[in-house]
């Protein structure tokens, strides 16, 4: 017999009754039933119930052990009595009567429990991540993550893609987030950077004559912590294709991403492959108040600026007259809601930094609220009829500058749906957001900036850059969204040196700046560059959605905390003086004040 096990803890069944077996694993739980000890023995594969009675030499050994100790059990497989079968375990029809117990590693008192799913402080969970990873849900999430990535690879290879690895040490790039810099020992005073994404390398692969590249790429960004993003490191399914239009990218990737969701849906509905809605950015901002719309939410925002332009309702009329907008957010079937519901929504909007959220109530066709009183019942009825709202539907209003009103309306749309229980949690709703603006106005610096990816092809090409107002130019850029999360982003690339120079010129960078900052790509484009495009899908977010996890730390092996600290390994940490000298680096204390 094998030194440690003849079977795993998830392998035994009724067909093994009568066999002598050897199992090894962790003591998950212990239950003392007066001279009979029941132990749940756990390994990576499952759980088996071990029984030790007064006649078993294993009893005193197991009684003395703390949970999470590692043991080897020799014993006989027996069938459980009918009333004690556990249908929740693959081994639930049997138990192993222990004859011998060998302690492989005794556990100290635990700083946190492993059995059960109770909440525990995050700093403890991260400091003792090796214990946290033993917990059932987190352990299953990590296993599922690996299976999702394997499924992605299989689907990409099936679609004709080949995996290539691009460098981890590269040059610092000025666009995007801050780089993680790596000092060069051989070249004092110079630095490598960890890649924020393999963007330039994958485009260079297309110029080099490769086609249909992909990799599961680690990406590094020195960003301030955010609730929906892990600090430091993340992974993306990165891909690029030559001689393609954006429609061909969508048609190629829907079976991959949609197929992954279908494979791990576990009964949840998924938007059918080939029918992902394609929503222009401007339409998304109007109807959903977001470029990451959750299409499980049935609420549609409407622009009602014209209705209030000459309405006599002073506040809205003034806003529209000075170039602002009024957006209406339906609140369906709220006739039974008290005024408190509507007032709390208004209070919430103010707490979020907005002027407020106006509202109209309606019950059996009768309107209520100050806006309805000022606007008049007939006008409100006509507006409700035009929008298809019913006799028991209320609504909210977001008014102000277009961007601010859209943001408030989008947040209100989400909050109303949550409050009213309108979102079906058992669906994955996917859609493409297309026709992003190529440029945007940077109010703080009073200048035009790229809104998305500077390497994208502007719609209309060089001619559009030369003749149009930059803020009216759209790009061949697109995002893939699922349930309110951006899970992928991509574009058709700009492979023309002239167009590239002009695009950067509009944001204030000269040809010399382009050659200095993006020299490799710029030079490559002068030697025959094919039309190409691609995208990158966030592996972490896709896995988070599939697992139904609340945050990215629940699907990541060894994440940092929100202060970008690895509490388990103690990173970041001071470097030894010898290391600093070799790198020609001196640490300067920050002065306070």
From Swiss-Prot:
The record marks 33, 83 as: Important for tRNA non-discrimination. GO terms for biological process: aspartyl-tRNA aminoacylation. It catalyses: tRNA(Asx) + L-aspartate + ATP = L-aspartyl-tRNA(Asx) + AMP + diphosphate. It comes from the Bacteria. One of its GO terms (cellular component) is cytoplasm. It is found in: Cytoplasm. Its EC number is 6.1.1.23. This is Aspartate--tRNA(Asp/Asn) ligase. It comes from Novosphingobium aromaticivorans (strain ATCC 700278 / DSM 12444 / CCUG 56034 / CIP 105152 / NBRC 16084 / F199).
